[in-house]
């Protein structure tokens, strides 16, 4: 029995801005995930990444891990729709995520269906 979602890491130098991961779930839906590590509030994107998410607003996501001081030994995950990239550019991690932990993020990906 297959475990879903299925992940593929994308290494692409010819298509600038392409997200880091391509996922596929049990509902036969493909989606992309841009991975970010954030210190503080600001999320850094290249102009190519911004353009990608503006051109492809459906089934695209941004997963940000916020690093905390090493004394706390934990980090937090936040998942955003790719269509919210301009809010992330402007407001950073103050943007409201659609999921805030690993389990909730996995449920978003597992439950994607055709429009």
What residue ranges belong to the model's regions?
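Nucleic-acid nuclease catalytic cores
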Residues: 56-84
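Structural signal for conserved beta-strand scaffold positions within catalytic alpha/beta enzyme cores
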Residues: 8-11, 34, 62-64
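Beta-rich catalytic cores
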Residues: 17
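Acidic-basic catalytic patches of nuclease active cores, encompassing PD-(D/E)XK
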Residues: 1-13, 26
